[in-house]
Amino acid sequence: MLFATLEHILTHISFSTISIVITIHLRALLVRELGGLRDSSEKGMIATFFSITGFLVSRWLSSGHFPLSNLYESLIFLSWALYILHTIPKVQNSKNDLSTITTPSTILTQGFATSGLLTEMHQSTILVPALQSQWLMMHVSMMLLSYATLLCGSLLSAAILIIRFRNNFNFFSKKNKNVLKKTFLFSKMEYFYAKRSYFKSASVPSFPNYYKYQLTERLDSWSYRVISLGFTLLTIGILCGAVWANEAWGSYWNWDPKETWAFITWTIFAIYLHSRTNQNWKGTNSALVASIGFLIIWICYFGINLLGIGLHSYGSFTLTPN
């Protein structure tokens, strides 16, 4: 009872905090005079991280196993993974800011986890025999970390497509340039370096607006780096799952719906990484492939759980009428 109460408190603290954080972040982004509020949003993200971490530890102690046995627990872990991604640029002392993607993703993920749809999964239960393995933590954690990473990379690619094809709205007008500078931290040194690179390289596309060009180049670079990391984690997760499947079911691969869609996900992002090596496909075409991958990930992760079919139906849930 104590652990259940603690988990309830920590979950709602983290959700409330992240809701405040995204409000502060958007106001600081749109209103120049409130730029100092970014420090407050970062403190809020830290508080959210410790709340989610506390929940995972409490759940682990109360259930006796790592909390990855159902959709509710996996969504909380996914929120935790998104925060880890949020901190990567700061650890590297990078000027790039992924919070525009990671913060809304965290609040949406945790908002769904704490909604009434998953109430029946809030209580920890004993693992079914097939899940009582040391591979549970390794396989599922790798898969969820890869999902979080690939989702962020796909959203960055989707942003590239939106920027390149959204011509009816002049987002890059003079009054909005300060937003771009604050969000992506342009500097004079970067300007002259990019300008020099622009004239040296014939492969760089020509944009009527320099800020549009610089922004899409930044997003494309970050998308490639994030998706490369996610693809590596996905590969490790699939290999761990194959070994576990052989121990549990006597076969490395059964073409279960979850396995099939995991393979499709892996193939889509393999195509993306391969397309990056071709100059004719690099840019808009590769971003389109990654954007398709965003939908494939949600089908693989959420859609199969919603259907509750196949060998991976342990964490599924059914929508019950009120």
Curated annotation (Swiss-Prot):
GO terms for molecular function: heme binding. One of its GO terms (cellular component) is chloroplast thylakoid membrane. It is a multi-pass membrane protein. It is found in: Plastid, Chloroplast thylakoid membrane. InterPro entries: Cyt_c_assembly, Cyt_c_biogenesis_CcsA, Cyt_c_biogenesis_CcsA/CcmC. It comes from the Eukaryota. The chain crosses the membrane at residues 2-22, 44-64, 68-88, 143-163, 226-246, 260-274, 289-309. Keywords: Chloroplast, Cytochrome c-type biogenesis, Membrane, Plastid, Thylakoid, Transmembrane, Transmembrane helix. May interact with Ccs1. HAMAP family: CytC_CcsA (MF_01391). Belongs to the CcmF/CycK/Ccl1/NrfE/CcsA family. NCBIfam families: cytochr_II_ccsB. This is Cytochrome c biogenesis protein CcsA. It comes from Brachypodium distachyon (Purple false brome). The lineage of its organism: Eukaryota, Viridiplantae, Streptophyta, Embryophyta, Tracheophyta.
